[in-house]
Amino acid sequence: MVSKVAAEGYVDLGLPSGLLWATCNLGARQPTDAGLYFSWANVDGHVPGDGYNFGNTTIGLPYSGTNGYNAKNYLSADNSFSPDSGYDAARYNLGGSWRMPTNTEILELYDNTTWQYTSVNGVNGILHTSTINGNTIFFPITGYIENTSLIVGQLVYLWSSTLHYKGNINTQNQAYIYLYGNNTVNRGEHSLVYYGFPIRPVYDPSL
């Protein structure tokens, strides 16, 4: 289990949903830290160099080479797994009202903030500023892990809890992500589920 200190605070951006975004990535102790890296639907996090190979990872959702992820048994109507499904890394590790954001909630963040590339304590990243109340939240550039290699460029990657659905929910192997690159946030981006990305938890007062 990840220590609760990993996400002990949140930022109120005044979002219409009432959702509150954690100040730190899951497993991080301050906003500029990367925290842990996760494959999608897997609750066990890893750090670069610990020997874990994401290419050989066993994703939480049952998988077969023929049928892919049998996701329909685990996902809600919007193709996101519920906080209590056992596959939400934020809810599993932090408990309480913490969970992973859905793709819709990432889009809500985009739609109600401005963003700029900046540096905080020597760490490059993206600062979002609420257009509603002026509060800010920082996402550090952390890269991602492919197999065992940490690849760091100028992009921010973060998992959502939402499967990328393209007609047959049982054969999908990608999930939606938060992605900043080329001086803008990228709507509707998705990635193969076995890459290692950080997670930024959200605090859901309704839970």
Question: Language model features by range: what are they?
Answer:
Residues 8-9, 14-207:
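C-terminal, surface-exposed recognition/capping segments
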